[in-house]
């Protein structure tokens, strides 16, 4: 077997006149009677190879037998294509290879779906079952090439900045808070379990206490939670921690790293600092803690109408400490029928809204179901507050503030997609800062950490832990890209007494805190430096930089929405002997 000269997708005019050897898969084959054209494919792309009896009758005979997905080796001379056959759609479209020798390395059965890039309308379950075939598609091959480039760029940046790549345990201790753990039973210790890490949070803090100063890891994390299009049970995290830093230091580092990645893999220069917005401002203006700022349509407080109008829904809402907010779809009045508005009402119902009020602005006033409740002065108030003009569609939700934010925030994004308002070429990064430290869980009747229990409160708010915990703000920051939470970080608690106080506010007894986190509390006794960090979702970053819409397309062997692997049929049953060794019994 000859050595490969280069990849198929890299054969350009630089190789003209050269004898080369290529190896790859038959993408397709065209028999023109006396001449056979084969598109040969590998991870770098496709090149056309030609079987002409003038060059080799024997090679032509073998080419007559090859079919799609055969693995072949060809040798031949690179020549320029005739002008009328040039293919500008591919990098190799100016050239072709006149084959003098071909060897069939391996045959292939007919695949369950075409690998050809033009034929991608295949049920995703079939694609996942035969993932090794799906990954041959050029679109996915390029996605994973970019994933490699992104991780390489991240590693180079962090290495240049003096970070150490340090691995942390995969088998660790199950701790409360956050999502459910994946548990691993111990054979050696009867009835005891390890947990797969949801993140290396505690270990990276311990590494700071160990004196390593700058740590990073591109690490697998595991969360047993309900899946969405942008969630997987196992995912990859760019985990970073630094000592002797404040919030500005961490944010600046994260920003510089992301700018470098975007420039190197997308060729896009991001000038200036990323915009910043407080959590409260994001919720007020966009109804989301991860707002998509590629389009406007902000939420507008029109609670004044509830005080001025004789409309019971609005009036009752304001009297019961609720609020009324509106969004304006510019020029969309004629695009949405009453039936469409009924569908939008059902949509906001999902988020707890009791209804969706709406009006259409016309030259002489308002039309729509609640238009008759607007007196002339109410119309003027509405137009002044919202800036709405003739032809605009104005939608209202009147409810508790959190319901208003969630429902209108989601509706805003839905409308933007339907109306084509989103510029898909934009990369809008945004920092969201000044997060609440705690949230109150109505079901559990206790406070829970908004991020995690190790996030430090703002220094001015430490006293509030004992008096008004819900008012305390955190030294926390999230990085958002195009409406997706790309990552989050915080300055950590590094004082044992403050950490114990935090556990107390979260409802832990001293005994429970010691049992679950005693190793961390003990470490704080031996000189813990101030430290903080950030964790970025690598899969999600790849998804956004490759313009994919599904996280599964960025993971080589992903799980389905029901957390199964269709390729290997995992999870699966195990033998009685294995269960016995683990002292386990399955109860159905």
Swiss-Prot record:
The keyword Cytoplasm applies. GO terms for cellular component: cytoplasm. It catalyses: tRNA(Asp) + L-aspartate + ATP = L-aspartyl-tRNA(Asp) + AMP + diphosphate. L-aspartate binds at residues 177, 223, 451, 492. The keyword Ribonucleoprotein does not apply. Its main location: cytoplasm. ATP binds at residues 223-225, 232, 485, 537-540. InterPro entries: Aa-tRNA-synt_II, aa-tRNA-synth_II, aa-tRNA-synth_II/BPL/LPL, Asp-tRNA-ligase_1, Asp-tRNA-ligase_1_N, Asp/Asn-tRNA-synth_IIb, AspRS_core, GAD-like_sf. GO terms for biological process: aspartyl-tRNA aminoacylation. One of its GO terms (molecular function) is nucleic acid binding. Keywords: Aminoacyl-tRNA synthetase, ATP-binding, Cytoplasm, Ligase, Nucleotide-binding, Protein biosynthesis. It is an enzyme of class 6 (ligase). Pfam families: GAD, tRNA-synt_2, tRNA_anti-codon. Its EC number is 6.1.1.12. Belongs to the class-II aminoacyl-tRNA synthetase family. Type 1 subfamily. PANTHER family: ASPARTATE--TRNA LIGASE, MITOCHONDRIAL (PTHR22594:SF5), ASPARTYL/LYSYL-TRNA SYNTHETASE (PTHR22594). Homodimer. Catalyzes the attachment of L-aspartate to tRNA(Asp) in a two-step reaction: L-aspartate is first activated by ATP to form Asp-AMP and then transferred to the acceptor end of tRNA(Asp). NCBIfam families: aspS_bact (TIGR00459), PRK00476.1 (NF001750). This is Aspartate--tRNA ligase.
């Amino acid at each position: 077997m000859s050595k490969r000269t280069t990849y198929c997708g890299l054969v350009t005019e630089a190789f003209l006149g050269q004898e080369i050897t290529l190896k790859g898969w038959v993408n397709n084959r065209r028999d023109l009677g006396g001449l056979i054209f084969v598109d040969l494919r590998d991870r770098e792309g496709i090149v056309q190879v030609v079987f002409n009896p003038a060059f080799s009758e024997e090679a032509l005979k073998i080419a007559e037998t090859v079919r799609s997905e055969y693995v072949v080796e060809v040798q031949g001379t690179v020549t320029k294509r005739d002008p009328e056959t040039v293919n500008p759609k591919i990098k190799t479209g100016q050239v072709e290879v006149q084959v003098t020798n071909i060897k069939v390395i391996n045959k292939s059965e007919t695949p369950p779906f075409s690998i050809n890039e033009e034929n991608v309308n295949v049920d995703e379950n079939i694609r996942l079952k035969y993932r090794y075939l799906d990954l041959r598609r050029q679109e996915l091959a390029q996605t994973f090439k970019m994933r490699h480039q992104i991780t390489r760029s991240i590693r180079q940046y962090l290495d240049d900045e003096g970070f150490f790549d340090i691995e942390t345990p995969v088998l660790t201790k199950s701790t409360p808070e956050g999502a459910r753990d994946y548990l691993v039973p111990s054979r050696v210790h009867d009835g005891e379990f390890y947990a797969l890490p949801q993140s290396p949070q505690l270990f990276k803090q311990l590494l700071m206490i160990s004196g390593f100063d700058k740590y990073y890891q591109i690490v697998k994390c595991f969360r047993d939670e309900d899946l969405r299009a942008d969630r997987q049970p196992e995912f990859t995290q760019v985990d970073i921690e630094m000592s002797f830093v404040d919030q500005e230091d961490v944010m600046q580092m994260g920003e510089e790293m992301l700018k470098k990645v975007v420039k190197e893999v997308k060729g896009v220069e991001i000038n200036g600092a990323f915009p910043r917005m407080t959590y409260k401002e994001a919720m007020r203006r966009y109804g989301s803690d991860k707002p998509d700022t590629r389009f406007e349509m902000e939420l507008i407080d029109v609670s004044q109408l509830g005080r001025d109008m004789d409309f019971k829904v609005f009036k009752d809402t304001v009297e019961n400490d609720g609020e009324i907010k509106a969004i304006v779809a510019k020029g969309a009045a004629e695009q949405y029928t009453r039936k469409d508005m009924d569908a939008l009402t059902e949509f906001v119902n999902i988020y707890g809204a009791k209804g969706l009020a709406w009006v259409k602005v016309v030259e002489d006033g308002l039309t729509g179901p609640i238009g008759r409740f607007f007196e002339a002065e109410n119309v003027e108030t509405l137009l002044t507050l919202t800036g709405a003009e003739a032809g605009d569609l104005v939608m209202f939700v009147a409810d508790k503030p959190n319901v208003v934010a969630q429902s209108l925030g989601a509706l805003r994004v839905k409308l933007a997609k339907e109306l084509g308002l989103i510029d898909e070429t934009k990369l809008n990064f945004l920092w969201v800062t000044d997060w609440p430290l705690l949230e109150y869980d109505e079901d559990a009747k206790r406070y829970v950490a908004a991020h995690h229990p190790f996030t430090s409160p703002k220094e001015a708010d430490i006293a509030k832990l004992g008096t008004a915990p819900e008012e305390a703000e955190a030294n926390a920051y999230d990085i958002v890209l195009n409406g997706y939470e790309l990552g989050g970080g915080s300055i950590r608690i590094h004082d044992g007494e403050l950490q114990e106080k935090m556990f107390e506010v979260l409802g832990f007894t001293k005994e429970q805190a010691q049992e679950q986190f005693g190793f961390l509390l003990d470490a704080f006794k031996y000189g813990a430096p101030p430290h903080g960090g950030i964790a970025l979702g690598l899969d999600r970053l790849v998804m956004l930089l490759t313009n994919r819409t599904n996280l599964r397309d960025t993971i080589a062997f992903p799980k389905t929405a029901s957390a199964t692997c269709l390729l290997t049929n995992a999870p699966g049953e195990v033998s009685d002997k294995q269960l016995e060794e683990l002292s386990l019994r399955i109860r159905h």
